[in-house]
Curated annotation (Swiss-Prot):
Residues that coordinate or bind L-serine: T233, A234, E235, E287, S387
UniProt entry keywords in alphabetical sequence: Aminoacyl-tRNA synthetase, ATP-binding, Cytoplasm, Ligase, Nucleotide-binding, Protein biosynthesis
Chief localization: cytoplasm
Protein name listed in UniProt: Serine--tRNA ligase
Family matches, as HAMAP family: Ser_tRNA_synth_type1 (MF_00176)
Gene behind this protein: serS
Family: Belongs to the class-II aminoacyl-tRNA synthetase family. Type-1 seryl-tRNA synthetase subfamily.
Molecular-function GO terms, alphabetical: ATP binding; catalytic activity, acting on a protein; serine-tRNA ligase activity; transferase activity
Recorded metabolic or biological pathway in which this protein acts: Aminoacyl-tRNA biosynthesis; selenocysteinyl-tRNA(Sec) biosynthesis; L-seryl-tRNA(Sec) from L-serine and tRNA(Sec): step 1/1
Length: 426
């Protein structure tokens, strides 16, 4: 959520920034917010005048009573003033509700570093690691490799649940588990993140706090009876861990890593990478989340991105880092990098991680603040997160980049201790 004071003082700048985003945003709502804000402030002035008058009249009552004078008219005036104030309070509550409704639907403002552009084709490659994998045979897609090795079963998952679900079997299940353990060990032991094992369901307030709601409700799986939601990412519960709290400045940055299953309806993605493990309704992911002081956040974003890159380097998977343009930025981020791995069967790079700085956008929605010391005024933290990284897509990238002509798959060296010393799946 944006700072209302910022909108008030820089409305034209805010409108221009929102106009440059990819999704067509109706900037006239900024004028609507400003109109409501002005109305609210005018009413507050009137309320203060009425309260001052009521207090003045009220202070006269004891003196007049002591003098034996009739105070019925003054009491009646006080009652009228109180009723008038109460009426204004009702009006203010309605205005606040309207302002909140609009503010929750205004996207974040892109950081000046974000490049211009309208679609993902305008994203800018920052760096890459390893050349795309080449083969002297026609490489197979990971869903064919996994099916042939009997380690992935899409057909039976379709029978049991539906499309875009998967059974991992035998060494496939062990490979998935190995990747999860390797990622968690790397981020906790080498990168100094504190591990969190979060709930897989959250309430509506939590989804609003991180920006999934109200805009993306159609993409969420809702448990309707209790107004709970299956988490689309561990970012939601881990960020909301500190909702409505004031953190200590000397504790920042706070760094958490969380493994979780993730659940997404992927509304509107029909026909896009729907085969295999790339776009599933349920998938596993290791998430990195940081809470920082504002002046630290962009330095910490670079570190977080590097932490996510480390596991891809150690796995030996070719990847690149792209800076996301304004048109592809998404609702909540101020600046975002995507890590994309090379997928031979696609003959292109596929996103495996998004690393974002939300600045104070989520912190305002979730009311997460910090104080430098006991006497200091609370300030909003900056929140950051990134996949560290998506598990299913990592497994897909391993199967495709490490495949052999005979259909076997070499296990990356760093995973072999987690695979009982095995070197090959065949």
């Amino acid at each position: 959520m944006l700072d209302l004071k910022r909108i008030r003082n820089n409305s034209n700048e805010i409108k221009e920034a929102l106009n440059n985003r990819g999704e067509k945003f109706d900037v006239t709502v900024i004028d609507e917010v400003l109109k409501l804000d002005e109305e609210r402030r005018n009413i507050l002035v009137k309320v203060e005048v009425l309260k001052s008058k009521r207090n003045k009249v009220s202070s006269e009552v004891p003196k007049l009573k002591k003098e034996g004078k009739d105070v019925s008219n003054i009491v009646a005036e006080m009652k009228n003033l109180s009723e008038e104030i109460k009426g204004f309070d009702v009006t203010l509550a309605k205005i606040d509700e309207k302002i909140q409704y609009i503010m929750l639907r205004i996207p974040n403002i892109p950081n000046p570093q974000v490049p211009d552009g309208e679609t993902d084709e305008d994203n800018i490659e920052i760096r890459n690691w390893l050349e795309p994998t080449k083969f002297d045979f026609e490489p197979k897609a990971h869903w064919d490799i996994g099916t042939n090795l009997n380690i992935l079963d899409f057909e039976r998952a379709g029978k049991v649940t539906g499309s875009r679900f998967t059974f991992y079997k035998g060494l496939g299940a062990r490979l998935e588990r190995a990747v999860i353990s390797y990622f968690l060990d790397t981020h906790t032991e080498k990168h100094d993140y504190t591990e969190i094992l979060p709930p897989y369901m959250v309430n509506r307030t939590s989804m609003i706090g991180t920006g999934q709601l109200p805009k993306f409700e159609e993409d969420a799986f809702k448990i309707s009876e209790d107004d709970y939601f299956l988490i689309p990412t561990a970012e939601v519960p881990v960020t909301n861990l500190y909702r409505d709290e004031i953190l200590k400045g000397d504790e920042l940055p706070l760094k958490h890593v969380a493994y979780s299953a993730c659940f997404r309806s992927e509304a509107g993605s029909a026909g896009r990478d729907t085969r295999g493990l790339v776009r599933q309704h349920q998938f596993n992911k290791v998430e990195l989340v940081k809470f920082t002081k504002p002046e630290q956040s962009y330095e910490e974003l670079e570190k977080l991105t590097n932490d996510a890159e480390t596991v891809l380097k150690e796995l030996g998977i070719p990847y690149r880092v792209v800076r996301i343009c304004k048109g592809d930025l998404g609702f909540t981020a101020a600046l975002k990098y995507d890590l994309e791995v090379w997928m031979p069967s696609y003959n292109r790079y596929v996103e495996i991680s998004s690393c974002s700085n939300f600045e104070d956008f989520q912190a305002r929605r979730a009311n997460i603040r910090y104080k430098e010391d006991a006497k200091a005024k609370p300030q909003y933290v900056h929140t950051l997160n990134g996949s560290g990284v998506a598990i299913g897509r990592t497994v897909a990238a391993i199967l495709e980049n490490y495949q052999s002509e005979d259909g076997s798959v070499t296990i990356p060296e760093v995973l072999r201790p987690y695979m009982g010393g095995r070197e090959v799946i065949k």
